[in-house]
Each structure stands twice: as C-alpha cells, then as structure tokens.
C-alpha cells in the first residue's frame, strides 16, 4: 500500500498534503468556511450532520490532491474508523423523542448511522467499491492498517480513502484521512 495524499482537520487546524491551510473560522464554522471556499457545489452539504460534513470536507480536500481526480469507478473503497459512531446524532435524535414532546426528527434520524458519511462520499464521486465504517474502542493505527490491507485483498480494489473520522459534536472533531493505492 502506498499513501498518495493525507488530510488532517481539527477544529482549529487544516493540513492538506503537509501544508497548513489558513481559515478565519474554527469549530463547526470552519467546516462551512472550507465548504464555501474549497467545494461550494454540493447543496446536500447543508443537510448533513457534523460527522458527514467532516468526512465530506476532508475527502474533498484529499481528492483535490489527486490529479486527475478519479470518479465513476468500481475499484475505490471508502473505509473510515472512529470511537463514538454517530453518538452525537443519537443524542440529538433522543431529544426529539423525549417525554416533553414526542416529535421525532427524520432529518436527524437519517444520520444516526455512522456509515452514512461513506455513502455520501461514494455517491458524490460515483464510487462503487467497498464502503465501510468501523467503530473501535480507541484510535489504533495497527488495527486500521490491517483492515485496510484486508480491503485490498479484493482483486477489484485498487485504491481507498481511509482513516480516522471522529466527531463528538459539531465543535469537537478530528479527521485524518489518506488516499491509498495498492
């Protein structure tokens, strides 16, 4: 496996290909600013939950490093890991079904599965390969590498967007994604 590109996003730092990108915002506002300045052409972004926004933005920056950008393919996997799954959205959804008012929100419920973010990225880029989201007890580079290596055992898989995508709430998050080739 060969790493072709790397992106790191935290509430106050964005690193793409080893270069720090400067933005005025932080936290949730940072993701919106990056979207407006670097992506800006995917209206579904504003319907996404914080985890999906983080993964979407990180993948867009990561794929911006690829020349030419690869789309409409069956040989690219999307494999993410975190420790809290979609717990932030689960808590938001729980608020809509509390005893004080039973008004479940379908808009929030849609994002109560962490693998929604892998689907959003696959749909955006027309990737038809494996999409997986693994929940680990903690960030474990060795385990993540082993799982990605297993994905490459599929003879169809030639590349992957893979890495850590943790979002405990809209202000606290970490993305460390890699573009990897076989």
Tell where the protein language model's regions lie, with residue ranges.
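Conserved "HGTGT" condensation-loop signature of ketosynthase/thiolase-family condensing enzymes
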Residues: 1-182
């Amino acid at each position: 496996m060969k790493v072709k590109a790397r992106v790191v996003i935290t509430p106050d730092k964005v690193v793409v290909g080893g270069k720090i990108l400067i933005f005025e915002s932080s936290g949730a506002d940072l993701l919106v600013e990056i979207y407006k300045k670097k992506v800006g052409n995917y209206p579904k972004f504003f319907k996404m939950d914080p985890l999906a926004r983080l993964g979407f933005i990180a993948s867009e920056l990561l794929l911006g490093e690829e020349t030419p950008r690869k789309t409409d393919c069956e040989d690219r996997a999307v494999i993410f890991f975190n420790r809290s799954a979609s717990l932030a959205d689960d808590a938001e959804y729980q608020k809509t079904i509390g005893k004080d008012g039973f008004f479940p929100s379908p808009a929030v419920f849609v994002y109560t599965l962490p693998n929604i973010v892998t689907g959003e990225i696959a749909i955006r880029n027309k990737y038809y390969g494996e999409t997986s989201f693994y929940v680990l007890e903690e960030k474990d580079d060795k385990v993540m590498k082993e799982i990605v290596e297993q994905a490459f055992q599929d003879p169809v898989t030639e590349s992957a967007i893979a890495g850590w995508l943790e979002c405990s709430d809209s202000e606290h998050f970490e993305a460390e994604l890699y573009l990897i080739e076989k």
